[in-house]
Amino acid sequence: MAEASFGSSSPVGSLSSEDHDFDPTAEMLVHDYDDERTLEEEEMMDEGKNFSSEIEDLEKEGTMPLEDLLAFYGYEPTIPAVANSSANSSPSELADELPDMTLDKEEIAKDLLSGDDEETQSSADDLTPSVTSHETSDFFPRPLRSNTTCDGDKESEVEDVETDSGNSPEDLRKEIMIGLQYQAEIPPYLGEYAGNEKVYENEDQLLWCPDVVLESKVKEYLVETSLRTGNEKIMDRISAGTHTRDNEQALYELLKCNHNIKEAIERYCCNGKASQEGMTAWTEEECRSFEHALMLFGKDFHLIQKNKVRTRTVAECVAFYYMWKKSERYDYFAQQTRFGKKRYNHHPGVTDYMDRLVDETEALGGTVNASALTSNRPEPIPDQQLNILNSFTASDLTALTNSVATVCDPTDVNCLDDSFPPLGSTPRGQVNHVPVVTEELLTLPSNGESDCFNLFETGFYHSELNPMNMCSEESERPAKRLKMGIAVPESFMNEVSVNNLGVDFENHTHHITSAKMAVSVADFGSLSASETNGFISAHALHQHAALHSE
């Protein structure tokens, strides 16, 4: 029969009632490809079978009516109307009239992969195509769920959840409740206190009752009072056509006059002028106390009045604050104290720490930079001293350096030691040493291209130089220092200028190029040229050149 052949050749046929369940392996389903060896084995198994009987059975089934075909495979017609009209209709019309019995692919995948959930991850689309009921009757004798049934089940599940929670769909709808029917009913005040309630003993004072006079007349009254008192701000609003601002004092006068507008205007004008004349200007001491209190207490005007400005009321402090913010005094105060960005100091709940960090950094940076500029600013050099410096000649400095240079032994690593012995017996005269302003590093190039000192910046150089790297083939030699101290008489300074300077050091001639030397000279005494040797002297240590001066 066709059932046996399908059961042996197709995995789908394994779900028939006569065959056992077929569970595909992970190798067959995960990578979604057919194993060629399995196909060859199936072909070899089917070589001895005769398929002519199967073809004949299929041809017979193709010409059979649908109801006979369903009965042949064990199905009973579930729809009588379809069975009655099957004789007068074609199979294609019957297929159109049948309900949508599209297979639930997820359900089939669960049935096929029930034992290998962790090993196989193939989808239902790779396993079965979408077929209708009359095509699947040959393979699946049990009834299958359709998509419509599944959708209906999902909707019913949602309804069950809503009913279980106790909220119907109508209750979940949001409705804006507007209207008189939604307003609360407030019972009338009886004026009696319960036994456990404390009687209110304070006497209240009514300041204004809006239900007695019409609103239009109240606006006219406010406009008239502003015109009579000459309030420029309110007059500007009236001319611009904006709404009139309430004046509590004028409304209170209208209430005291039993809503008589003319009498209220006259009384308000008299009291208003008296109150304006009674306001006195703040003194300088009060202004400073107010500003200092703002830095301490922030905008807590009660503490400001209590601790710093006791001569004024809290209302006067508040009024002065708004006038003070519009003055130039506030601009100067905010510039000096950054009052506008110090809100976090008065309100610890604010967590804008980045703004606080930026503000404090800017404040510290401004203070440090100002002090650094003040301390590092050199004193101006007088014109007389500049003329002395410009009178240097190259020959004078060359003679100076050649007179004090000696040969250093290259094999002695410690020939330039930092610990120079003091000059004890060297004759000295009265000299004025060159004052030091800043200290710069003299560095030799490490690539060995040129034997020269490079002075990267123009400035005043200390007499005791920092460690400098020497141009030499021995790159691993430790850094050495050259200590120099120069005391120059006036006669020598008048003739020497700097154009080119050469120094012999360790049998290498080093030229100081692209350098500008400036010496800050405080005072030169009247010295003769013969006294030069008393100020410029050479001291040899381990056969090396050293210039040292106290």
From Swiss-Prot:
Residues 1-60, 113-170 are annotated as: Disordered. Residues 174-272 form the ELM2 domain. Residues 154-163 have a biased composition (Acidic residues). One of its GO terms (molecular function) is histone deacetylase binding. The modification Phosphothreonine is found at T163. It is found in: Nucleus. Its main location: nucleus. It comes from the Eukaryota. The keyword Repressor applies. SUPFAM superfamilies: Homeodomain-like. It comes from Macaca fascicularis. Residues 1-16 have a biased composition (Low complexity). GO terms for cellular component: nucleoplasm. This is Mesoderm induction early response protein 3. One of its GO terms (biological process) is negative regulation of transcription by RNA polymerase II. Residues 17-36 have a biased composition (Basic and acidic residues). Residues 277-329 form the SANT domain. The keyword DNA damage does not apply. The modification Phosphoserine is found at S52, S53, S114, S156, S165, S168. Keywords: Nucleus, Phosphoprotein, Repressor, Transcription, Transcription regulation. Transcriptional repressor. Pfam families: ELM2, MIER1_3_C, Myb_DNA-binding.
